[in-house]
Design a protein with these regions (language model features):
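Disordered, charged N-terminal biogenesis/targeting segments of membrane/secreted proteins
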Residues: 1-29
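Single-pass transmembrane signal-anchor helices and their membrane-water interface zones
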Residues: 10, 34-61
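Short, flexible helical or helix-coil boundary motifs
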Residues: 17, 183, 187, 372-375
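Intrinsically disordered, low-complexity polyampholyte segments enriched for Lys and acidic residues
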Residues: 34, 84-89
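Preferential activation on post-signal-peptide N-terminal prodomains/segments
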Residues: 61, 65-72, 78, 90-317, ...
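Segments that shape or occlude catalytic/ligand-binding pockets
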Residues: 258-409, 413-421
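C-terminal soluble interaction/assembly domains
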Residues: 400-408, 414-455
Length: 455
């Protein structure tokens, strides 16, 4: 959702997005705000055995109990034969793209690009150098991808309150049973959380639905959310990490973080059905230069497309109990322990609309520079230029406010230094811009960036 920290009704936020917000309040942050758990972060990513880049200044997806694919389309059922990889040169692709799209994908419906909601502030981040900025995204411009799937989001909230939707109360209870079996837990009791009165007032015709179901077990608390995510909060005994592990948000080094992720992966990846887990540790800085780290894993098994879907839609996040009952930084734990883990899978409720032809990152950059795209960066900042666009990656935007789930090129654009954004510490600020990755002929409303919450 946009942004994940802006809802004060914390009980209505999908657990897949609250990790960063579920901490003791910190010092005032810079003008940028995180969109999601990984939307604004300086990341270090690797498979468990791969070394990470040192942090500055430091002394569809796979089958599982939760990560599953959506139902295949009729055409996919008729033929399981893999598509032959295309080998034409980039120049050939440019000259033949329109003909190929028209002949192979005439049945695809046109897509309306969802509006971009940013809540308070705008989406951006700060790093010391863009070369440090790694989020663990498996996509690269060298991948031979000509199409990517587009989905209708079954967890979309038309009230735009950001309320998790999708599964019924009974379906969530069934999920809890599967998780309890996987973790070897016995469910003792369950409690259902219902939508608050705001949703009913917004549209009196709307039937009040269950938001989540929580189960007390003999080994902790399980929670299934209507949007498809789930979490497990272990008992204090189960949550404690062995000696020698460090699991904090700001005082853990990259090496320590990867060691902790390796331990947690060994403990939970197989239970959750990850075949080839890839660990990512990332974070961003406030304007005092304080680093704020998060931890997650995703399944790196499968084709390039499947891994991209796993990365964007199907993650397991780990939250630290670094603060415990502490009121501020001075009282927090030095080593930390596991507060909870959360597993997301937006595709559980998604309806596949088809495999849509995509444009290249270079084509998307040209569109961005011509004024096409979406951003929550305020209008008093200069428009992107070829010189200020410093990083690009392909992502899917997720959350209850995204009616359609489609690939975008995300551009990180250097913003002018401002005194309240850590520039005096050497931090550089970046704003985030999006350009739809699907071909323009399949878009009904190619967005144009005119500044300030455009659509």
């Amino acid at each position: 959702m946009n942004g994940n920290d802006f809802l004060d009704k914390m009980e209505l936020i999908d657990l897949a997005y609250v990790e960063a917000a579920d901490k003791v309040p910190k010092k005032k942050r810079a003008a940028w705000l995180k969109w999601g758990a990984v939307a604004a972060c300086l990341c270090v990513a690797a498979a468990i055995v791969v070394a990470v880049v040192p942090q500055r200044g430091e002394p569809q997806p796979s089958e599982s109990i939760h990560l599953g694919t959506t139902a295949p389309s009729e055409s996919e059922r008729e033929s399981d034969a893999p598509t032959e990889p295309k080998t034409e040169k980039p120049s050939e692709r440019e000259t033949e793209a329109t003909t190929e799209r028209n002949s192979d994908t005439v049945s695809l419906e046109k897509i309306t690009i969802p509006d971009l909601y940013a809540g308070f502030g705008f989406e951006g981040f700060a790093v010391y150098d863009i070369s440090e900025y790694r989020r663990g995204n498996p996509w690269s411009p060298d991948m031979d991808l000509t199409t990517l799937p587009v989905y209708r989001n079954g967890a979309y909230d038309p009230s735009r309150a950001g309320v998790p939707r999708g599964f019924t109360e009974e379906e969530m209870k069934e999920q809890l049973e599967r998780y309890a079996d996987a973790f070897g837990l016995t469910i003792l009791s369950t409690e259902t959380k219902w939508e608050n009165v705001y949703v009913k007032l917004h549209d009196p015709r709307t039937e009040r639905k269950a938001v989540w179901v929580e189960a007390q077990t003999d080994g902790g608390v399980l929670r299934a959310v209507a949007s498809g995510s789930a979490s497990y909060t272990p008992t204090r005994e189960r949550a404690r990490l062995p000696e020698g592990y460090r699991f904090t948000y700001s005082s853990t080094t990259d090496e320590e973080a990867m060691k902790t992720l390796a331990y947690l992966t060994e403990l939970y990846a197989d239970v959750l059905g990850l075949v080839q887990p890839v660990a990512v540790t990332c974070g961003d800085y406030d304007y005092y230069g304080k680093f704020d780290r998060i931890y997650f894993i995703y399944d790196g098994a499968g084709t390039a497309e499947e891994v991209i879907l796993n990365y964007n839609f199907c993650r397991v996040g780990f939250a630290s109990d670094e603060y415990g009952d502490a009121k501020d930084d001075s009282e927090k734990s030095e080593a930390g322990s596991l507060r909870y883990l959360s597993q997301s899978n937006t595709l559980l409720l998604a309806e596949k609309l088809g495999d849509y032809p995509i444009i290249s990152a270079e084509e998307a950059k040209e569109l961005l520079l011509s004024g096409c795209g979406q951003s929550s960066v305020p209008p008093d900042y200069p428009a992107p230029t070829a010189e200020t666009v410093e990083h690009v990656e392909l992502i899917y935007r997720i959350g209850a406010l995204e009616e359609v789930l489609l690939p975008y090129y995300r551009f990180d654009v250097r913003l002018p230094d401002k005194s309240n954004c850590g520039a005096e510490l050497g931090l550089k600020s970046y704003g985030v811009y999006y350009v739809p990755a699907i071909a323009a002929e399949y878009i009904t409303n190619m967005p144009t960036y005119t500044g300030w919450f455009n659509s």
